[in-house]
Amino acid sequence: MKRRTAREKALQALFQIDVSDIAPNDAIEHALDGEKTDAFFEQLVYGVIEHQVQLDEMISGHLVNWKLDRIANVDRAILRLAVYEMVYSDDIPANVSLNEAIELAKRFGDDKAAKFVNGVLSNIKTDIES
């Protein structure tokens, strides 16, 4: 599975977990839709779940005039996924995670999602790199 596909499927699983409160294994199975699983995909899903509190704190600290629970569910899932990659995946450059998140926002979010995701993640990236 290509990494972009793994990210898309991880986003779908994380979104389902967030809005439906279903078990991660069920969300993963549904997102895979019969496809073979992938280590990167599972790392993303389980990593975000494991570190969600820290990820949410980091994201919340970079929101201007927003609260995390008021952000669109898909945007919140994209931010969690990208911040997880930026913080916990040493083999992925932060710019790649940021760009992939913007592409996910363009594909799955509304018209303003990509700009919003870019702004939040750019600030987080700056903090991580400093």
Swiss-Prot record:
One GO cellular component term = cytosol
Alphabetized SUPFAM superfamilies for the sequence: NusB-like (SSF48013)
The source's superkingdom equals Bacteria
Tagged with keyword NAD: no
Q: Which controlled-vocabulary keywords does the entry list?
A: RNA-binding, Transcription, Transcription antitermination, Transcription regulation
Task: Extract one GO molecular function annotation from the record.
Answer: RNA binding
Keyword RNA-binding attributed: yes
One GO biological process term: DNA-templated transcription termination
Matching entries from HAMAP family are given as: NusB
Q: Which family does it belong to?
A: Belongs to the NusB family.
NCBIfam families the UniProt entry points to: nusB
* Function noted in UniProt: Involved in transcription antitermination. Required for transcription of ribosomal RNA (rRNA) genes. Binds specifically to the boxA antiterminator sequence of the ribosomal RNA (rrn) operons.
Protein name, per record = Transcription antitermination protein NusB
Q: Which organism is it from?
A: Bacillus velezensis (strain DSM 23117 / BGSC 10A6 / LMG 26770 / FZB42)
